[in-house]
From Swiss-Prot:
Induction: Slightly induced by abscisic acid (ABA) and salicylic acid (SA).
Name the record gives this protein: Protein S40-7
Family to which this protein belongs: Belongs to the senescence regulator S40 family.
Keyword annotations: Cytoplasm
């Protein structure tokens, strides 16, 4: 049994042929394909090597850069925007500010944080891409309360022109009110006083006998719904049904 199992990674071209033959299904290896075939087999499965065979850090960095170039040309990394200055792998992913802009931002954050007691570590992590701010709505679309809170047109309530009533106008209005009250009293006297129903019937009977047929008087008025036989007999006598 092999104690040091070897991990074999296929190239992107072989992965593409495998994915094409898999009935058109998208495989994860098609997107995240890493080619590390440039590494020598001795460096992959030999944990300890002699000092003569050890590579210098500069040569290892050069080999890693060449391997990253192959990675950039395949998978989802090919869709990332390319930088104008450098062609390294990190420049495709992270877009930092230039050195001059970064130094000014660090100095400004350091001066502001020294006054407040903080450090200047937050300035080094700032990116070159500024976050776009949302466009402000026009002034006429803002509500009335928000328009004058931020120093708008009306810092306070709008002035209202309230007319001042003079003493002469007040006296004239009082006289008009008194005259209207007097006219209302005269109209009530002309209409007559309110009388109960039986007195109205008595006055109408005194004027003419034809006004005696009224719902306000008669045999049924004294019954109040208790016995309607007298009402029935009175109606029959008046109509001639009963002699």
């Amino acid at each position: 049994m092999n104690k040091n199992p070897r991990l074999d990674f296929s190239s992107p071209s072989s992965l593409a042929t495998i994915s094409d033959s898999a009935d058109g299904e998208l495989n994860e290896d098609d997107i995240f394909a890493i080619d590390i075939s440039h590494a020598p087999p001795q460096a992959r499965h030999s944990p300890v090597s002699s000092p003569a065979k050890q590579q210098t850090p500069a040569r290892q960095l050069q080999r890693s850069k060449s391997g990253l170039k192959n990675v950039e040309a395949s998978g989802i990394l090919a869709a990332l925007p390319e930088s104008s200055g450098s062609s390294s792998y990190l420049s495709h992913v992270f877009h930092h500010k230039p050195a001059a802009a970064l130094s000014t931002s660090v100095s400004s954050t350091a001066s502001s944080s020294s006054s407040s007691g903080g450090g200047a570590s937050a300035g080094s992590s700032s990116s070159a891409r500024a976050i776009p701010t949302a466009p402000k709505p026009p002034q006429e679309r803002l509500p009335f309360s928000a328009s004058f809170v931020g120093g708008g047109k009306y810092p306070q309530s709008a002035p209202v022109q309230v007319p001042l009533v003079s003493s002469a106008m007040m006296n004239r209005h009082k006289k008009e009110f008194k005259l209207t009250d007097v006219v209302d009293d005269d109209e009530e006297e002309e209409e007559g006083e309110m009388l109960p129903p039986h007195e109205i019937v008595a006055r109408s009977l005194a004027q003419s006998s034809l006004l005696s047929c009224s719902v306000l008087e008669g045999a049924g008025r004294t019954l109040k719904g208790r016995d309607l036989r007298q009402v029935r007999n009175a109606v029959f006598r008046r109509t001639g049904f009963i002699d």
